[in-house]
């Protein structure tokens, strides 16, 4: 059974339901949170109960849809004093304020901004609340279905690109890859972005296939046999979520600390040939904002001559942002650094969460959620349409994504 970060029951467009997996409780407890309003969507995004740029956008859109559904219910209208439903224009004014509120939940991930821009266009084109609700339903369904399909295409594109490159340079045998944060089914509608590429590599290895031709591989054909996910402090998305997904899919993997990556590359019994990372926003020149620690990983990979790939959908590329210096970088609460939360060790019965302080309460903390990797350290950007590489001058040309 595949992992589901978002459960969207869509049989009847007037009676949809949305639940999101509380990822702060993983990997020990699987508990879903119902989403009924925009405020619910804001809360789970802001608290990082749901995370990953594609999933954030999807949950944001679904929270608008379910709020519209409730507004169509007269029992609910009576308690929603902040909406004026005397006219569609009055409703639209309030909805725009709600969308602006939702956008403030996570400012770095551009997918949410792009999705809410689409919602505003639907709001402008509709003439009634019920029509807007129906169009939101169609858009939400399309967004989820396209995300999964695009993720599979991205995964295959990334896997084929790496295997082709290894074959071209004459490499044969087993190899390993690195990844950071969580970019799999838990960060998307399904399959994943960077972790999707790793899934595709593992499928090639299991099937004994080379890329791009689906023929039986020789015993020495390149094949990925191991993954090294970084723990990804301070929220530990690598140790809590990516490790959980790799175990779920039975992909051979060994969890490593963020600080041990250079030594792991240096001593790995299986050569590490690539790092696959996701993105929360890609600037027009290819500079990439991703989970804090990504820049450090890129620098280490450059030192050791390891290919560094960014895997992200077209919606993550921001044509209005020229370079990484223009990307707003979210800073999180200092206590998210000072305190670690997890399952209580040695507890019997159902796992219980416990929080442990790991730094003095009055110690100043700098806790950025993201860093920005300059395009100079990125070998390729993998999208659902194709893989982008740099020209002879070392620059990406992403212009076709904006036409």
Swiss-Prot record:
Q: In which pathway does it act?
A: Amino-acid biosynthesis; L-methionine biosynthesis via salvage pathway; L-methionine from S-methyl-5-thio-alpha-D-ribose 1-phosphate: step 1/6
- Residue(s) at site: Transition state stabilizer: 181
List cellular component terms (GO): cytoplasm; nucleus
Protein name, UniProt field: Methylthioribose-1-phosphate isomerase
Free-text function comment from the UniProt entry: Catalyzes the interconversion of methylthioribose-1-phosphate (MTR-1-P) into methylthioribulose-1-phosphate (MTRu-1-P).
Family per similarity comment: Belongs to the eIF-2B alpha/beta/delta subunits family. MtnA subfamily.
Which Pfam family, any one, appears in the UniProt record? IF-2B
Catalytic reaction annotation: 5-(methylsulfanyl)-alpha-D-ribose 1-phosphate = 5-(methylsulfanyl)-D-ribulose 1-phosphate
Q: Which HAMAP family match?
A: Salvage_MtnA
Q: Could you confirm whether the keyword Nucleus appears in this record?
A: yes
Q: Which residues form the active site?
A: 280
Q: Which InterPro entries match?
A: IF-2B-related, IF-M1Pi, IF_2B-like_C, Initiation_fac_2B_a/b/d, M1Pi_N, NagB/RpiA_transferase-like
Source organism per UniProt: Eremothecium gossypii (strain ATCC 10895 / CBS 109.51 / FGSC 9923 / NRRL Y-1056) (Yeast)
